[in-house]
């Protein structure tokens, strides 16, 4: 017997702990529990993630029960919300009947419309699920000290320093070690557990093995967790440090995307289990041992939660009825779009991201001029690139997080000689270093105290200008370090060349293939206008840690500027156009592609690289810019009501002011309200107000002979839209578990995430202010309704081919409908590769 095994034996509260599971069984349970955690992207590219991603192999109802038992989480709104919707007529008896007709989620849930209405009116306290207890939970009960919070705070404090990405000036001395090793090294010096009363903590710490996998196995053996409850227990532990576990899951996601693996999540689980064993050992004689044995017995034999399931079933039926109410109104709008005035050739075709915020602007632009056709496509416009700014050596992925960048593009200075480019790079790098040194002086532990006195008065002017919204508190990273003249000349460089050990740029065959793929995916292969605008999108906000969450998710949490500028360069290239003819795509010689960026906060559109637009199109461009200004005015007027902007004020000024107001917690509503995804020709939705709630993707199945574009839509944009929809869903129904709380209390930690206040777990999801205006829900949780105009046989074949798509659909995480020739919904997918006709 080794010394470690001897130490472990002597610390057990069981007389003779024996292995109940093989190491392989334990490793398999660890893997399954870790897969239940959804990734959390850092603030620098905060993209929307489905918080239920690890549970999509469960039905929506089953997942609701699992999360109630493992995290005390809700997946529906308070019952009073549905009762009010019934009372005011939003939910009708027909909606309730339709919800009941689909089946009862759990036994003894209401089975009639009358019973369901009575259930909604019931004001009795809502029961919660029997949450699987951890040893920390039991220790809290027997000692009176909140050990669950103490453990989370302790791990979070360590993790904030360990994962820090440049915010702190004193780095952890163990930052280069694997997470578990780094934590053990630091915990050996930490007396907080001893002060708090966990007298066995350091003894347990010393006795544990040196690797995370071995520690987990030893801890499970010591705790005698049965096989029937092991995955649930491990998942419960990870949910107790949900934010940091989610960030570790992101590290693994990124590693796996590029063919690697990351063990940080396993390390965190080992850390959490050390705490469990230590608390068990510390408080065994105070009642924890007996309480834990009862918990183990419940893991073996299950819990009696029939009453909770009855209530949960009723709540899920009300949620389903609420979704039927939305569906009824949406379907009534379709198939009645007014035909536009026939035009042989549009003056402008304007392609926007499918983002729901574009729906309002697209409708406004088409209202301004009937000679403009708008197009919806994922905002990276089919160009999955890594974009490296001038003077940087690495860039960000400008594509959906489901994809990996296929090309690396750098910035250069247009028209500059190599020496001028080098000088611009040197100057920007120097300014960035000086700014970093100055910031270190301001915030360093020693110099910060002497900074305010002699230098503080010099900041009075800037403070006033920032407060008035005239200047930005922090320079925009895209332009920081560049003078005005250089900034105007910076543009993407596509030429293939070696850079920092990599081959960057795009060859001509690569440009032709990418251009053909993008145009086909947009269903834009003929009848080109004189001007084709590709408009990416971004947002303008200040003092907002989650700012990148308002940028383009299809661009990996960045603006779409880089993608549209690259796309336009390629599509205007005569050599590329010549190559496109071999793909059956003939772009007229008088068609010019133009790059733009839609600011979703202000509804202003910026046109890039105007100097590249030929003089022959100068009048066309001026007219387009006037149309964009007019459309922006209409869009701001429509959004003003949701933003609580007084219509008697200068709406344009008031909306723009929000983008520079550093006290504004709701500069815009982002994608709040998202509820539908429609892939069809634009004429199906033209002239219809969808209230900024629908993702609109152009698709013409008649031009998609092999249905490869349909497959792309159902496996990429549809999935991304469901992630966004379910992130907003989770942040609304239970912001405590799936959201990030009160934005006014946020503190950035390590530049990668936020805490609510000065402690607690890293927060996931959206702030409460992103879904609620203080009086009502601006985002109403409705699972995504996907409407596609395509043969149901083609959609069924794609569902069969892709497991994740089938899981999302068969388990009710989103709804799929087919649109017919007349624009009306004809069929609904009901699961198991079956469809039913819609009345």
Curated annotation (Swiss-Prot):
Belongs to the inorganic carbon transporter (TC 9.A.2) DabA family. PANTHER family: INORGANIC CARBON TRANSPORTER SUBUNIT DABA-RELATED (PTHR38344:SF1), UPF0753 PROTEIN AQ_863 (PTHR38344). Zn(2+) binds at residues 353, 355, 537, 552. Keywords: Cell membrane, Membrane, Metal-binding, Transport, Zinc. One of its GO terms (cellular component) is plasma membrane. This is Probable inorganic carbon transporter subunit DabA. InterPro entries: DabA. It comes from Chloroflexus aggregans (strain MD-66 / DSM 9485). Part of an energy-coupled inorganic carbon pump.
């Amino acid at each position: 017997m080794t010394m470690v095994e001897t130490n472990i034996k002597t610390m057990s509260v069981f007389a003779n702990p024996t292995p109940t599971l093989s190491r392989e069984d334990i490793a398999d349970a660890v893997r399954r529990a870790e897969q239940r955690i959804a990734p959390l992207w850092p603030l620098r590219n905060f993209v929307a993630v489905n918080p239920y991603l690890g549970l999509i192999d469960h039905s929506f109802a089953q997942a609701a029960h699992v999360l109630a038992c493992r995290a005390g989480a809700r997946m529906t709104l308070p019952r009073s919300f549905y009762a009010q919707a019934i009372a005011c007529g939003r939910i009708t008896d027909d909606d309730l009947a339709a919800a009941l007709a689909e089946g009862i989620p759990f036994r003894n849930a209401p089975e009639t419309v009358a019973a369901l209405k009575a259930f909604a009116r019931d004001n009795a306290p809502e029961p919660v699920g029997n949450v699987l207890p951890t040893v920390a939970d039991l220790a809290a009960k027997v000692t009176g000290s909140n050990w669950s919070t103490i453990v989370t705070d302790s791990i979070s404090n360590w993790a904030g320093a360990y994962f820090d990405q440049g915010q702190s000036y004193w780095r952890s001395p163990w930052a280069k070690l694997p997470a578990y090793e780094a934590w053990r090294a630091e915990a050996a010096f930490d007396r907080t557990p001893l002060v708090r009363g966990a007298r066995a903590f350091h003894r347990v710490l010393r006795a544990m093995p040196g690797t995370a996998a071995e520690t987990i196995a030893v801890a499970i053996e010591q705790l005698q967790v049965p096989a029937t409850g092991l995955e649930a227990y491990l998942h419960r532990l990870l949910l107790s440090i949900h934010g940091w576990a989610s960030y570790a899951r992101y590290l693994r996601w990124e590693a796996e995307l590029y063919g690697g693996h990351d063990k940080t999540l396993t390390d965190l689980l080992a850390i959490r289990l050390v705490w469990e064993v230590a608390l068990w050992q510390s408080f065994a004689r105070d009642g924890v041992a007996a309480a834990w044995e009862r918990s183990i017995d419940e893991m073996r034999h299950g819990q009696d939660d029939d009453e909770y399931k009855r209530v949960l079933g009723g709540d899920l039926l009300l949620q389903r009825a609420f979704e039927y109410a939305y569906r009824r109104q949406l379907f009534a709008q379709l198939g009645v779009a007014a035909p536009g005035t026939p035009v042989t050739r549009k003056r402008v075709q304007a392609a926007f991201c499918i983002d729901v915020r574009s729906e309002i602007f697209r409708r406004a632009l088409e209202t301004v001029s009937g000679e403009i056709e708008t197009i919806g496509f994922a905002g990276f416009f089919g160009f999955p690139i890594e974009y490296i700014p001038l003077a940087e050596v690495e860039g960000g992925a400008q594509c959906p997080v489901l994809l990996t960048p296929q090309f690396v593009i750098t910035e250069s200075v247009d028209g500059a000689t190599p020496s001028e480019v080098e000088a611009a790079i040197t100057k920007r790098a120097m300014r960035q270093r000086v700014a970093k040194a100055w910031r270190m002086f301001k915030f360093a532990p020693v110099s910060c105290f002497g900074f305010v006195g002699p230098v503080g008065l010099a900041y009075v002017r800037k403070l006033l200008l920032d407060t008035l919204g005239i200047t930005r508190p922090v320079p925009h990273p895209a332009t920081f370090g560049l003078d005005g003249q250089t900034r105007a000349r910076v543009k993407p460089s596509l030429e293939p060349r070696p850079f920092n050990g990599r081959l960057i740029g795009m060859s001509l065959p690569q440009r032709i293939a990418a251009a053909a793929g993008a145009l086909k995916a947009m269903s834009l292969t003929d009848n080109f206008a004189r001007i084709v605008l590709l408009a990416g999108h971004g947002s303008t906000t200040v003092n907002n840690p989650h700012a990148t969450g308002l940028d383009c998710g299809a661009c990996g949490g960045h603006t779409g500027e880089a993608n549209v500028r690259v796309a336009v360069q390629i599509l205007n290239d005569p050599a590329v156009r010549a190559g496109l003819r071999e793909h059956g795509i003939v772009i007229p010689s008088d068609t010019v592609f133009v790059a733009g960026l839609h600011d979703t906060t202000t509804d202003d559109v910026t046109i890039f690289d105007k100097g590249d637009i030929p003089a022959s199109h100068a009048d066309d461009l001026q007219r387009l810019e006037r149309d964009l200004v007019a459309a922006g005015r209409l869009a701001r007027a429509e959004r003003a009501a949701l933003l609580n902007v007084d219509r008697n004020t200068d709406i344009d000024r008031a909306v723009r002011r929000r983008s520079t107001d550093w006290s504004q917690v709701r500069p815009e509503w982002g994608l709040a309200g998202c509820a539908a995804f429609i892939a069809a020709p634009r004429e199906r939705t033209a002239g219809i107000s969808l209230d900024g709630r629908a993702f609109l993707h152009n698709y013409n199945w008649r031009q998609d002979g092999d249905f490869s574009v349909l497959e792309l839509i159902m496996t990429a944009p549809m999935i991304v839209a469901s992630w966004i929809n379910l992130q907003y869903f989770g942040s609304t129904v239970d912001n405590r578990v799936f959201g990030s709380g009160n934005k006014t209390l946020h503190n950035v930690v390590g530049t990668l995430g936020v805490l609510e206040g000065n402690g607690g777990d890293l927060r996931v999801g959206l702030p409460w202010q992103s879904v609620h205006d203080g009086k009502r829900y601006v985002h109403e949780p409705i699972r995504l309704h996907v409407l596609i105009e395509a043969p149901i046989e083609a959609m069924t074949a794609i569902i069969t081919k892709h497991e994740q798509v089938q899981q999302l659909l068969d388990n009710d995480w989103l709804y799929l409908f087919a649109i017919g020739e007349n624009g009306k919904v004809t069929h609904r997918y009901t699961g198991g590769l079956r469809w039913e006709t819609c009345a």
